[in-house]
């Protein structure tokens, strides 16, 4: 008769021993893993022992998807494995390969704080006009002005009109005193070029032809008298330019008066520049109303 001490010893369950003996074949070894395909599913059965020495059966089901890849990628998958992985099955081995999402590397020039905005001297000058066009007052060179072609056509038409004998040719400019002496020596005013010429009398208000006055509207606030002089001078000689300015800001009020010497030049200025795009605005050029003389 067995003693009572033997009855108190822990023994494995009879059902566990039967299952383990059926799976291991009474050899005590772990059976190899198996793989079964059922349509689009792949069932992988694996065996392992836990910390207590019990045999565990792990069944993993995978869904097989067929994807079209590039030819180079398909060739790489057919490469033979080498080293410790030469006996592995096709595909990644979870013991040596970790499949995860793609990680995109973003390089930054400033490692400490990439979002910090440092004081860049070029950014400080971005709000200032370093380059200013002489035609449209934009932030670009005069040679790259979008209105350059339109002004060239106007200058070409004026040259053709001047060559045909029409009035309005500008008078010859006086000689430059600095060009009279190239040696750099002092020349007395009486000995300079043009000293013996007789001065011309200035025309009085009654002699001024106010019928050759035009009114220009829709000007920008940055417009100056020199800009109007450069724009209207090719059309004929100008006797006076009046640009209306604000007495506090000294900026243009948007209109000006141009007095031409000849009425034909004023009419041609209205025909050529009325509707012309200047400084992102469309100019309106018309005849000015005559002033009332007392």
Swiss-Prot record:
Signal peptide: none annotated. Residues 194-211 have a biased composition (Basic and acidic residues). GO terms for biological process: formation of cytoplasmic translation initiation complex. Disulfide bonds: none annotated. The keyword Transit peptide does not apply. One of its GO terms (cellular component) is eukaryotic 43S preinitiation complex. Residues 1-43, 160-211 are annotated as: Disordered. Residues 212-290 form the RRM domain. Keywords: Cytoplasm, Initiation factor, Protein biosynthesis, RNA-binding. It is found in: Cytoplasm. One of its GO terms (molecular function) is RNA binding. Pfam families: eIF3g, RRM_1. The keyword Nucleotidyltransferase does not apply. RNA-binding component of the eukaryotic translation initiation factor 3 (eIF-3) complex, which is involved in protein synthesis of a specialized repertoire of mRNAs and, together with other initiation factors, stimulates binding of mRNA and methionyl-tRNAi to the 40S ribosome. The eIF-3 complex specifically targets and initiates translation of a subset of mRNAs involved in cell proliferation. This subunit can bind 18S rRNA. Belongs to the eIF-3 subunit G family. Component of the eukaryotic translation initiation factor 3 (eIF-3) complex. This is Eukaryotic translation initiation factor 3 subunit G.
């Amino acid at each position: 008769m067995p003693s009572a001490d033997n009855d108190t010893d822990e023994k494995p369950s009879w059902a566990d021993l039967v299952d383990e003996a059926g799976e291991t074949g009474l050899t005590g070894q772990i059976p190899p893993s198996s793989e079964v395909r059922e349509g689009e599913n792949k069932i992988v059965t694996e065996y392992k022992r836990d910390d207590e020495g019990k045999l565990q059966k792990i069944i993993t089901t995978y869904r097989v998807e067929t994807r079209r890849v590039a030819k180079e990628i398909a060739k790489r998958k057919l490469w033979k494995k080498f080293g410790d992985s030469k006996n592995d099955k096709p595909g990644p081995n979870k013991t040596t390969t970790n499949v995860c999402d793609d990680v995109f590397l973003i390089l930054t020039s400033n490692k400490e704080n990439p979002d910090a905005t440092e004081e860049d001297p070029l950014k400080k000058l971005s709000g200032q006009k370093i380059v200013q066009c002489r035609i449209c007052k934009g932030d670009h060179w005069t040679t790259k002005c979008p209105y350059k072609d339109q002004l060239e056509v106007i200058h070409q038409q004026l040259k053709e009109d001047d060559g045909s004998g029409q009035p309005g040719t500008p008078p010859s400019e006086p000689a430059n005193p600095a060009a009279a002496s190239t040696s750099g020596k002092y020349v007395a005013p009486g000995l300079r070029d043009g000293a013996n010429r007789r001065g011309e009398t200035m025309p009085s208000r009654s002699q001024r032809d106010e019928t050759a006055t035009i009114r220009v509207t829709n000007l920008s606030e940055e417009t100056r008298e020199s800009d109007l002089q450069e724009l209207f001078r090719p059309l004929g000689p100008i006797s006076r330019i009046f640009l209306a300015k604000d007495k506090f800001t000294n900026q243009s009020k948007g209109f000006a008066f141009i007095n031409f010497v000849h009425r034909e030049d004023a009419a041609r200025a209205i025909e050529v520049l009325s509707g012309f795009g200047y400084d992102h605005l469309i100019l309106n050029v018309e005849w000015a109303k005559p002033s009332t003389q007392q």
